[in-house]
Amino acid sequence: MSSSRPAHSSSSSSRTRQSSRARILAQTTLDAELNAEYEESGDSFDYSKLVEAQRSTPPEQQGRSGKVIAYLQHIQRGKLIQPFGCLLALDEKSFRVIAFSENAPEMLTTVSHAVPNVDDPPKLGIGTNVRSLFTDPGATALQKALGFADVSLLNPILVQCKTSGKPFYAIVHRATGCLVVDFEPVKPTEFPATAAGALQSYKLAAKAISKIQSLPGGSMEALCNTVVKEVFDLTGYDRVMAYKFHEDEHGEVFAEITKPGIEPYIGLHYPATDIPQAARFLFMKNKVRMICDCRARSVKIIEDEALSIDISLCGSTLRAPHSCHLKYMENMNSIASLVMAVVVNENEEDDEPEPEQPPQQQKKKRLWGLIVCHHESPRYVPFPLRYACEFLAQVFAVHVNKEFELEKQIREKNILRMQTMLSDMLFKESSPLSIVSGSPNIMDLVKCDGAALLYGDKVWRLQTAPTESQIRDIAFWLSEVHGDSTGLSTDSLQDAGYPGAASLGDMICGMAVAKITSKDILFWFRSHTAAEIKWGGAKHDPSDKDDNRRMHPRLSFKAFLEVVKTKSLPWSDYEMDAIHSLQLILRGTLNDASKPAQASGLDNQIGDLKLDGLAELQAVTSEMVRLMETATVPILAVDGNGLVNGWNQKVAELSGLRVDEAIGRHILTLVEDSSVSLVQRMLYLALQGREEKEVRFELKTHGSKRDDGPVILVVNACASRDLHDHVVGVCFVAQDMTVHKLVMDKFTRVEGDYKAIIHNPNPLIPPIFGADQFGWCSEWNAAMTKLTGWHRDEVVDKMLLGEVFNSSNASCLLKSKDAFVRLCIVINSALAGEEAEKASFGFFDRNEKYVECLLSVNRKVNADGVVTGVFCFIHVPSDDLQHALHVQQASEQTAQRKLKAFSYMRHAINKPLSGMLYSRETLKSTGLNEEQMRQVRVGDNCHRQLNKILADLDQDNITDKSSCLDLDMAEFVLQDVVVSAVSQVLIGCQAKGIRVACNLPERSMKQKVYGDGIRLQQIVSDFLFVSVKFSPAGGSVDISSKLTKNSIGENLHLIDFELRIKHRGAGVPAEILSQMYEEDNKEQSEEGFSLAVSRNLLRLMNGDIRHLREAGMSTFILTAELAAAPSAVGR
């Protein structure tokens, strides 16, 4: 379903992309119209009225392509810069000036009395060679940028003017046909000359990054509050906000911190037009935007007249803001601002990349929001601090992505749970009324303010819903206008063209519809968005009048309310998918209930599914066991209580503890005391489903290995799960790092020439690379060449972060921008002097093969203790370990597929069962005789038994007595139980010529008792089935029973029920009988598992099962405890 139009079969992600593109195009046109009106109107510009007028204008009348092009050209090529720096545009071939700002000659060539002997100062103009303006090495470094594909890696370049000796940060970016260089003065007192270099900027953000990384997941609010607090402390601005874009492109101040006395904007919503699409595009290109003084006069750019097109300033921080934005800032007393873009992965759920997919094919990016800083006086932030803020925003974006993933998992789980509950309610009553009148109901499926059901020409309403006549009118409109669609969703009935939208008022704006049949419809309703908006900490009464011509956040809030007064929150794709799923279930239920269902083939489907699933799982399990035993890496496993149940030969060899000695011991007794808390935490988290990676702990050694010291392992904890995705144990897949640590310790102790160690071809020397304090690659050993395919001379003296490792245009490609950010954090932590933990790391080698490894980073210091760079050690898991991890992943995927298959089968079976129920209910009203009614009752009982079995699919371990299998307490007749159970084996008896004889006392069998008759029927049918299966052809099965009444009070009696099933022949094989008594036997057969479940049910009834084997005869003796019905007590 798609917004404001009929449903289609396209995927959620494609619908999102289509609607997003449409919104962007529409807003860009509106932005251009507003800009043109502002330029023409001057002081008479009325922002509020124009937003409302443009919203009501038909799309075909909005804007003209000429206006849009002119607007975009004006934004990107405005030929004006801010005066806190100057700008040069250089021809890439000649290195000569082709454009410069009017203030550049004064800033770059003015002679200073502090610099003697400047006889002929250079002049700056069109055609000037830029080398004549600066001293070496700055001029050389600037020229070196010409050969870089991504020149931003070199920023900032520290240059010094020849005439004045003044230092500048040269910030380089590439535009069409030229290099554009921003020059910003350096204040040596605040940032000494040695501060140039991207890695130094990362150090400024180290504290803030650590704070963000230490946050527990699960709270977007806490994450946003933390980042605004850290930016506030880092930059010193008066106000810092986290500004979030919603799906319809409007914005909201999601988090905020201010200095005392400043009015907060927290909770304020802005129209989408407040931040034009052109500005958002520029934020995607240049992720930090600074305005130092909105009252300062802009500086013009002088260009070579031979240029065919104006210089693009998209990448320039100096680019002058639009006059409209400057007026907006001044009106809200925000004289200076700093804005960082928060760029996250596009939400394309159907296009999830594979783990080893090249980075060029990774997800697209989108602008989630902005981190906005305001100051009430002019403020300049030097480039190193701005770069630190940009990096902090990238780290924040990585965590926003993680929160999205977590929210998605929780959301899908909740929707699946609600769909299951609603499906069960539908199945029980075979009518959609149950999901309206019951609890939960359809309002619990998606967020809404009201809902309704039109079914059988009757209307049922829930909470805030239109009247019955209005719902019928909406249904008529749907049939007339959207008759061919299966549903509809819109955030505005008015915009969707419903003629009666005005009569519904503001409380009914958005609607989602699912048609069950042409006349039966489900509705969900939402109120207008303004009802969801709260002003947090407002001191200004929103009802007070503002000057509509004065652009201000308060006025934007008013404009937003005007825009959305007829709109609700939009219906998201996952909500529409949930509605569509319920729609399909309802259709299947009602369609199957309208005709007799065909039950043939049902048993075969279930049987095939079980057999296929068991065979596949057994094959994978066997492979896992074989791999674990023969792997050349240490692998150990524990059960839910921490007792060792897996200990392969490799870990036995390293520790000196044999397999038979380790099995059954608690894992905490086998690790060194210093590692007990680590392993305890790791085990606890893994049993909760949270798997820790790359944790280092030490294992005790025994026997001949005792004197060798502990075994140092780096371990991944892998939760072992059953078919129902429940954690039943933990597997530890490890790497022996003992030798690796010895090499590293030896390396770090060497004070002299370390090259002999780095470049030693000994296979024990791991791959090593390094960088100096400025980020240039300084080391690349032979093992690294073998691992990556890149030779030392191809990478040394290149930027480690950017040219050697990057998500694009690098020697070793990383699979995503997030991975690059994580690598930057690890390197930065080491440079800042922090003890860095081992981190998972991956890259594509020269042959585009993906390499997964562990990375440890150590800082390199000189004799004075000053950090001069970093050394990075790589440890690559063996092929056996990687294969074991892949097999484990395959096992988990297989279990997940089986779980989904069982879930599908349960829902698929419900529909034909509903049809069977309908057929029997119809037969009851056709005047059946007593025998025919008895057969119908047998069918009902079998139906209810199957319902119980399907519900058991949710149980974790149904063979365990402590499982949550439920027992009902209801009145039933024992004869009905036995007859229904016998009916389930009669076809098998006829095929083998087996006679079934029931020697049951009639009075006892017709007695009414209390208990779970359906579960008892299930038990009896299971034991009858195996008795018939293992009886010889032409044999017999005899059934007898005995009831013993025990009084436990004046009016309360318990009945000890005993049922014997005797059959001829060799009987049930001994191995199946033994499986019946084993609760956790991985080798259980289908019959053994079924009997184990039945025995568990009997034990829940305070009974049990015994088996007697005599000459040529076998007997099952079933016992259970029941309660006597009052009528039975009176007899």
From Swiss-Prot:
Binding of phytochromobilin, residues: C324
SMART domains: GAF, HATPase_c, HisKA, PAS
Any GO CC annotation of this UniProt entry: nucleus
MF terms (GO), sorted A to Z: phosphorelay sensor kinase activity; photoreceptor activity; protein homodimerization activity
Domain called Histidine kinase: residue spans: 904-1124
Post-translational modification: Contains one covalently linked phytochromobilin chromophore.
Protein name (database record): Phytochrome A
Organism the protein comes from: Zea mays (Maize)
Upper taxonomic lineage: Eukaryota, Viridiplantae, Streptophyta, Embryophyta, Tracheophyta
